[in-house]
């Protein structure tokens, strides 16, 4: 990339690889990047979007040094008027970085920041009320009440897991075992939840796309997915999902047979969506569903509204508890400009032809 880059680095002191921040900063400086400011993500709390301010200060690069939650928290500062975004994957899973083929080693990630290419990628947007159906964008009121996410929005089981896993008390008590302990406790305490789903822009046969039905399910979890890779180093991926297709993947997980659910999720990530003969007895399938795996429902759409008849339920965005149902989730009108490896950019362009 021509010219000297001037960067702000926003980091998370509590991310999984936070102790490597100093090494990462040294590599950035050695690569010729001037670090104008280095600040924790908490410094942005309660502030309006800072992108225009950063540009006015001569900053042309915003580096997110952390995990998925930090990247998601940076979006509102850079998505419209702001420096391009770069990612230093210092989190635990780093699924957003993995979805963009950004190397997990510091030297490789810095090389992408120095010599990568700018790509326009989708981000999700969550609104507490129904989103505007206008193709031209959102009203000022809708946008003011919205939150962005880069990877996944969830309701159900993952909300309780996120609350436990990010608890300072849990982290101090269990250390490296926090995640598995939090997962077991969330499973023990969680009860199925009734949800109502209403889609816009369903992908699938014409007859399915025309359906306006509200769908009701008892679920353990609903995940609205933008970036396809899950599971950190396991590199699990939702088949057919992309961060450049302007669509969200919605997966509803039903119970209560955990062995069946675990097997079905494994098949989903392995690229099998099942066949019509594999649907569980009595299972009703919407015509736009992409899977017949027992215990799972999978759709692809530009927007989904989620409500919970029993009352408001909290949601997570990129693992952070933010907002509650009823909520409308859609692809943001503007893409996010982010630095990616040239090879990823080329493969994505080829796949889109």
Describe each PLM feature range.
Residues 191-193, 218-220, 244-249, 300-302:
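A generic structural signal for short beta-strands and their flanking turns/coil linkers
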Residues 1-62, 72, 76, 134, ...:
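ATP/NTP phosphate-donor binding region
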Residues 8, 41, 80-84, 90-224:
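Catalytic core of DAGKc-family lipid kinases
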Residues 169-178, 230-233, 238-260:
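Gly/Ser/Thr-rich active-site loops/lids in small-molecule metabolic enzymes
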Residues 158-161, 205-207, 230-234, 258-262:
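Short acidic/glycine-rich loop or secondary-structure boundary segments that cap or lie
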Residues 154, 158, 223-240, 321:
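Glycine-rich phosphate/pyrophosphate-binding beta-alpha loops
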Residues 211, 242-245, 252-353:
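ATP/nucleoside-binding phosphotransfer catalytic cores, i.e., glycine-rich phosphate-binding loops
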Residues 64-68:
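N-terminal glycine-rich "phosphate-gripper" loop used for MgATP/nucleotide binding
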């Amino acid at each position: 990339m021509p010219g000297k880059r001037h960067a702000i680095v926003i980091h998370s002191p509590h991310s999984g690889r936070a102790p490597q921040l100093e090494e990462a900063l040294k590599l950035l400086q050695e690569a010729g990047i001037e670090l104008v400011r280095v600040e924790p993500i908490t410094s942005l709390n309660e502030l309006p979007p800072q992108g225009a301010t950063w540009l006015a200060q001569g900053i042309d690069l915003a580096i997110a040094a952390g995990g998925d939650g930090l990247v998601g928290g940076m979006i509102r500062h850079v998505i419209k008027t702001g420096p391009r975004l770069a990612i230093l994957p210092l989190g635990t899973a780093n699924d957003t970085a993995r979805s963009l083929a950004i190397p997990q080693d510091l030297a490789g990630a810095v090389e992408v920041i120095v010599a990568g290419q700018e790509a326009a990628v989708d981000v999700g947007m969550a609104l507490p009320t129904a989103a505007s159906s206008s193709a031209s964008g959102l009203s000022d009121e809708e946008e003011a009440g919205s939150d962005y996410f880069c990877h996944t929005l969830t309701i159900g089981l993952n909300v309780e897991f996120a609350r436990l896993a990010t608890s300072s008390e849990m982290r101090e008590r269990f250390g490296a075992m926090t995640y598995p302990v939090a997962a077991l406790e969330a499973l023990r305490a969680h009860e199925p939840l009734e949800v109502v789903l209403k889609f816009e822009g369903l992908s699938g046969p014409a007859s399915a796309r025309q359906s306006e039905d509200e769908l009701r399910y008892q679920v353990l979890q609903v995940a609205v997915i933008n970036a396809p890779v899950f599971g950190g180093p396991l590199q699990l991926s939702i088949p057919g999902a992309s961060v450049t297709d302007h669509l969200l993947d919605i997966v509803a997980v039903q119970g209560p047979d955990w062995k069946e659910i675990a097997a079905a999720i494994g098949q989903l990530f392995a690229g099998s969506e099942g066949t019509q003969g594999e649907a569980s007895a009595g299972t009703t399938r919407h015509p736009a569903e992409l899977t017949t795996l027992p215990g799972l429902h999978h759709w692809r759409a530009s927007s989904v509204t989620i409500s919970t008849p029993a009352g408001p339920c909290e949601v997570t965005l990129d693992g952070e508890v933010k907002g509650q149902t009823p909520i409308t989730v859609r692809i943001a009108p503007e893409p996010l400009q982010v630095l990616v490896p040239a090879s990823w950019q080329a493969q994505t362009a080829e796949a889109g032809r």
